[in-house]
Amino acid sequence: MNVSVVTERRTPAYSSLAAGELNGLVARALLTEARLTPKPGLVDIRNSGAHRDMDLAAFERSTTAIAPWMEKFFIMGNNTAALAAENVLVMLRPLGMACENDMLQATNGVNTHRGAIFAFGLLSAAIGRLIARGEPLEQNRICDQVARLSRNIVAHELSAKKAGKLTKSETHFQCYGLSGARGEAESGFRTVRTQALPVFNRVVQEHDDTHLALLQTLLHLMAWNDDTNLVSRGGLEGLYYVQQQAQKLLWQGGVLVEGGIEAMQSLDDELILRNLSPGGSADLLAVTWFLSHFPAGSLYPE
């Protein structure tokens, strides 16, 4: 089956970035991920994946609603750059809640991008801080700022014993040790920097094909990311199933070998039957594409 895809080439690396430009770059990251096809269990051009309450049009409306908020995260990060990073998170939360409200209005109450709002809100604030400090916009510096903004977020929000029923995120952490999006942010997007970006860059360099690079990167994320979206839908069994199937495809060459795209489509069909959607990995894929537009920089920025 042939499917139409968006195969936008990466723009030259950004040495600086205006707040308004940031809105556009985040929107392109979200739309590039949403339109990438085929994505097992996820909304794409081919189908709605394992989701019965959303489709590609909903993701496009959601992107239009939330992208303008990135400028506000940027400005907050820029205006508070003199403060210790860990003291800024509380100031970002109201922006995140308002952004999420606009998303829900655009999608008639469907959560299309909550994880992406969290990730890109932090990234936008981090970029604002770096520009205010006169520091270069580099992948490792941006992610280091995200880690500083998110310091102790797992301990504060997931570890503490509370009265009443645990949230899904608290259950995932306290029962299984899975820290989800908060843990990834607190690590400075370690999974993206150590796994996803190297794969993406290698495939782009060797094949000059952003579409293939994104699909191969998604497979790597599905294979190794402890995606709590999968745990919510299928328990640990669902997570392990997706990881094992993605690893199997990678051992066979992934989408870089003959029949690889068809194998992704078959896995898509299987995950739909099992009601499994690796939404956390999809968010990290969008983050990967976004960060690829900046130079890597030194591994341990000052």
UniProtKB/Swiss-Prot annotation:
Keywords annotated in UniProt: ATP-binding, Nucleotide-binding, Transferase
Catalytic activity: 3'-dephospho-CoA + ATP = 2'-(5''-triphospho-alpha-D-ribosyl)-3'-dephospho-CoA + adenine
Keyword Transmembrane helix: no
Enzyme Commission code: 2.4.2.52
GO BP annotations listed: prosthetic group biosynthetic process
Broad enzyme group: transferase
GO molecular function, one term: triphosphoribosyl-dephospho-CoA synthase activity
NCBIfam families: citrate_citG
Family that this chain belongs to: Belongs to the CitG/MdcB family.
Name of this chain's protein: Probable 2-(5''-triphosphoribosyl)-3'-dephosphocoenzyme-A synthase
Organism: Salmonella gallinarum (strain 287/91 / NCTC 13346)
Lineage: Bacteria, Pseudomonadati, Pseudomonadota, Gammaproteobacteria, Enterobacterales
Gene name as annotated: citG
